[in-house]
Amino acid sequence: MSWIERIINKSIITPTRKANIPEGIWTKCDSCGQVLYRAELERNLEVCLKCNHHMRISARVRLHAFLDQCSKYELGSELEPKDILKFRDSKKYKDRLIAAQKATKEKDALVVMKGTLYGMPIVAASFEFGFIGGSMSSVVGTRFVYAVEQALLDKCPFVCFSASGGARMQEALMSLMQMAKTSAALAKLRAQCLPYISVLTDPTMGGVSASLAMLGDLNIAEPKALIGFAGPRVIEQTMREKLPAGFQRSEFLLARGAIDMIVNRLDMRWRIARLLAKLTSRPPLKSTNSQENTC
């Protein structure tokens, strides 16, 4: 017992308790450092409430927020990746797949859904960056083609949200073939005059940016998204020159005509719906930016 406890009446001494706060309640913004309430950040679609920084969001959460709630149906969910080449670098490809599937609860890096957007029939796809960097595998390419074929069958628009490091090196040439495969599928969509909107999110790089991500009738980007083929560090090392500030960011690309517009994630659902209404000669939507996706 300390000397202060001997002097002061024990009845007025209240032992302190450690606050029992569960993990994951709070998170910090990568851009401004603001401490954010996790549940509030999720309601705001992973956009910082202080600085508007767009954090990465899972493919499934993005699609559920984008499409009308009562109409979603997943396509290609039965497809799973195979380690045909028995590839191994610092780790077996098979083990990488198991770890990625466990971490993301997805079978591969692309989720495709058929549904409606403000009542308009639509097919939408979204990359899961948490699955081996959103890299494009044979399954990703096949699911993308499934999405295009469904859009052709339903004669409806197709929207794809890209977030990828490029082709999956563990599948070698089979992964590179998906660039041509997805591009050929999109050519069929264009031949039928069906709209394809590509939304480039952070990051969209490599073989994905060199194929399906830049082939949209409209190419939209989220704010400050990294978009390019090789990364800025690789370019600097190759050219031995310092790159301009903001190089390969969506604002830099918009100023030079490489993309069509930049749209905040919270406005994306409404803006795309309005664009598709015009592209498909539908009646204009009511002039309200409602983010509710109920039917």
UniProtKB/Swiss-Prot annotation:
Cofactor note: Binds 1 zinc ion per subunit.
Chief localisation class: cytoplasm
Domain CoA carboxyltransferase N-terminal stretches: 25-294
Zinc finger residue extent: C4-type: 29-51
Main function: Component of the acetyl coenzyme A carboxylase (ACC) complex. Biotin carboxylase (BC) catalyzes the carboxylation of biotin on its carrier protein (BCCP) and then the CO(2) group is transferred by the transcarboxylase to acetyl-CoA to form malonyl-CoA.
GO molecular function, one term: ATP binding
UniProt-annotated location(s): Cytoplasm
Catalysed reaction equations from the record: N(6)-carboxybiotinyl-L-lysyl-[protein] + acetyl-CoA = N(6)-biotinyl-L-lysyl-[protein] + malonyl-CoA
HAMAP family named in the record: AcetylCoA_CT_beta (MF_01395)
Record GO cellular component, one term: acetate CoA-transferase complex
NCBIfam families: accD (TIGR00515)
Domain of life: Bacteria
Required cofactor names: Zn(2+)
Protein's name according to its UniProt entry: Acetyl-coenzyme A carboxylase carboxyl transferase subunit beta
InterPro entries for this protein: AcCoA_carboxyl_beta, Acetyl_CoA_COase_Trfase_b_su, ClpP/crotonase-like_dom_sf, COA_CT_N, Znf-ACC
Entry EC no(s): 2.1.3.15
GO BP term, pick one: fatty acid biosynthetic process
Keyword terms of this UniProt record: ATP-binding, Cytoplasm, Fatty acid biosynthesis, Fatty acid metabolism, Lipid biosynthesis, Lipid metabolism, Metal-binding, Nucleotide-binding, Transferase, Zinc, Zinc-finger
Subunit structure: Acetyl-CoA carboxylase is a heterohexamer composed of biotin carboxyl carrier protein (AccB), biotin carboxylase (AccC) and two subunits each of ACCase subunit alpha (AccA) and ACCase subunit beta (AccD).
Pfam families per the UniProt record, alphabetical: Carboxyl_trans, Zn_ribbon_ACC
Gene3D superfamilies membership: 2-enoyl-CoA Hydratase, Chain A, domain 1
Pathways involved: Lipid metabolism; malonyl-CoA biosynthesis; malonyl-CoA from acetyl-CoA: step 1/1
Residues at which Zn(2+) binds: C29, C32, C48, C51
Organism (species): Baumannia cicadellinicola subsp. Homalodisca coagulata
